[in-house]
Design a protein with these regions (language model features):
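Non-catalytic, C-terminal membrane-associated alpha-helical segments of glycosyltransferases
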Residues: 145, 151-152, 159-206
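Short alpha-helix within the catalytic core of nucleotide-sugar-dependent glycosyltransferases
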Residues: 1, 30, 38, 51-63
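The conserved acidic donor/metal-binding loop of glycosyltransferases
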Residues: 45-49
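Conserved nucleotide-sugar donor-binding catalytic segment
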Residues: 34, 92-172
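Acidic donor-binding segment of Leloir-type glycosyltransferases
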Residues: 1-18
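Short aromatic/hydrophobic "clamp" motif used to bind/position activated sugar donors
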Residues: 41
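Conserved donor NDP-sugar-binding/catalytic core segment of glycosyltransferases
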Residues: 53-85
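Glycine-rich, basic loop-to-helix element that forms the pyrophosphate-binding segment
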Residues: 18-36, 57
């Protein structure tokens, strides 16, 4: 909150909305989308951070390319003795459609930007891996997401984000692919295996 207030004092177009209690990530993101009056929507998890020009550069890309969904490359990092340890940057493909995404969840939530009017009534469902479900539903509308061409997102790896939850994530990936992506039994097996493999390839076991 202190960091947000610093930015609010510098920019009069920033609004901060307080919740009386923690209602979860999905509720907060859906509320932000509903209250937003901007042309584009971006999300930044509290563990992650952006380079200073991330939003400006990405908006310029969206305006020039006329894309409704974009993302950036990103660099994973973790904390060791309060020091940031950076891993190899994840270079995301130039273009990603729905079929590609469900086999490799390579779009970091904190890296993406979506045209608000395109989101429409799509919401983050109140499930584990709500960001995977949301991005799947956006891409299923028929758009092709595009790489904005810069590495401006830094994604923090925590114990909760990877290995300690791998079995839970497999379960919810299976559930989302069945309910939202309407994949066949074999399609769900393929998706879960490829997502698991690509996650290990990008982040390792840390």
């Amino acid at each position: 909150i202190e960091i947000l207030n610093v930015f609010k004092h510098k920019h009069n177009n920033i609004n901060i909305f307080y919740l009386s209690k923690n209602k979860g990530v999905a509720f907060s993101r859906n509320l932000g989308i509903r209250l937003s009056k901007s042309k584009y929507i971006s999300f930044l998890d509290s563990d992650d951070y952006w380079s200073p020009n991330k939003l400006k550069d990405q908006i310029n890309f969206m305006e020039k390319s006329k894309k409704v969904f974009s993302y950036t490359d990103y660099t994973p990092f973790f904390l060791k003795n309060d020091k940031k340890i950076y891993k190899k940057s994840v270079i995301v493909p130039d273009l990603i459609n729905h079929d590609q995404f469900i086999n490799d969840t390579c779009i970091a939530t904190s890296s993406m930007m979506i045209k608000r009017s395109f989101i429409g009534k799509i919401k983050f469902p109140k499930v584990i891996l709500e960001d995977y479900a949301f991005k799947s539903k956006i891409l299923k509308k028929g758009c092709i997401a595009a790489n904005a061409g810069n590495n401006s997102t830094f994604y923090r790896i925590t114990k909760d984000s990877l290995s300690s939850n791998k079995f839970r994530n497999i379960y919810w990936s299976w559930h989302i692919n069945k309910k939202y992506n309407k994949l066949s039994f074999l399609g769900r097996i393929k998706s879960v295996l490829l997502i698991s493999f690509n996650s290990l390839r990008k982040y390792g076991f840390k």
